[in-house]
Amino acid sequence: MMKKYSLTTHSTETCQILFTSVSNVFKYIPSGTRRILIMYQDSVSQVLPIFSAASGVQCYRYLIPDSESAKQLGVAEQCWRFLAQNNFTRSDLIVSCGGGAASDLSGFVASSYLRGIKVIHIPTTLVGMVDAAIGGKTGINLKEGKNLVGSFYSPYIVLCDPSMLTTLNEEHLKSGLAEIIKCGFIQDESILSILEHNAQDHMDCSQRVCAETLPPKLLEELIHKAVSVKITMVDSDFRDTHKRQFLNYGHTLAHALEAATSHKLPHGQAVSIGMVYAAQVAFAKGLIGRNILTRHERILETYGLPICPPEVQWRNITPYMQRDKKNMQSNDTDSDKDSREMPQISTQSKLVLLREIANPFISSVSHTVLLKAYEAMFPQ
């Protein structure tokens, strides 16, 4: 049975998030569409035969790189040129098939080509289903940091088919679980309780739970809970000025670690480490007790996610943390200053922290506390 969510992205626009078979995609193609560009990753090429059944629509395929390699300006330019060379118009359509990087890139390409053509996302990873494809954020990376160039652009439809997750490997499932667990910490504590209860039944001799052993019905329940959390936060703050930023819990350090390691650290692992770090910061500031910090470590480690950063020196991380989007707001109120003067490097960074579970807020934290919390994450 199909399940549907509605997400209001602008005052006059609503994005439908549909849980149904991917084979139903042609039911939702906008009328008048003559051309479709399918931007896909090699790992999901098995989806392509579905589009060969299109009637009256010309389908083009465009293979994009896997993972963060797709999110480059050069790749976006190649896509724009392909669209132009094949005479795509505003009445045509892009369909993305793949993980979070596929929806990030295709959304950015769609938002900028001809100043906007429709895009449908078909997320095929757990991260894509619960996070990246939902909410209208698009982005590509620069050497200076992750997702520094992008737009807010609502997809026409997001089509989620949980049956596609059955072929995901353990690492991809764990990455998605990190985003689901994040939703438990910032809003819906029942997510944490479900995972903790499941761990009691499926823990192996190493005190770990293999993500691949999650019962399909349980995984689908967790997906719907995480999607509901994201919709609640995006619906009231599409342009990411306040409440939506809570979805960045754990992401300040995560994005910095990804950039500092040249994206060798998978996103979900980085988010896991970032959440433990945010809990360490909150604990250092006296906002939460050790019990909440320990709960972070226990649930993430139980599901095979890392809780300790790789060996990356603090001085290599701080430049990326300072470029975090939450810090990109001018505090300069002196009108006599030369507008060309370079701003001073802040001695603080903004992080999403918890006062308690499901009670997030944004806090400015001194670099002294940030360093102390980072050092506390390494075994003594």
Curated annotation (Swiss-Prot):
Its cofactor is: NAD(+); Co(2+); Zn(2+)
Q: Per UniProt, which keywords does this protein have?
A: Amino-acid biosynthesis, Aromatic amino acid biosynthesis, Cobalt, Cytoplasm, Lyase, Metal-binding, NAD, Nucleotide-binding, Zinc
Q: What is its main location?
A: cytoplasm
Record GO biological process: amino acid biosynthetic process; aromatic amino acid family biosynthetic process; chorismate biosynthetic process
Q: Show the Pfam families listed in the entry.
A: DHQ_synthase (PF01761), DHQS_C (PF24621)
Q: Which pathway, metabolic or otherwise, does it act in?
A: Metabolic intermediate biosynthesis; chorismate biosynthesis; chorismate from D-erythrose 4-phosphate and phosphoenolpyruvate: step 2/7
Spell out the protein name for this chain.
3-dehydroquinate synthase
State the gene name recorded for this protein: aroB
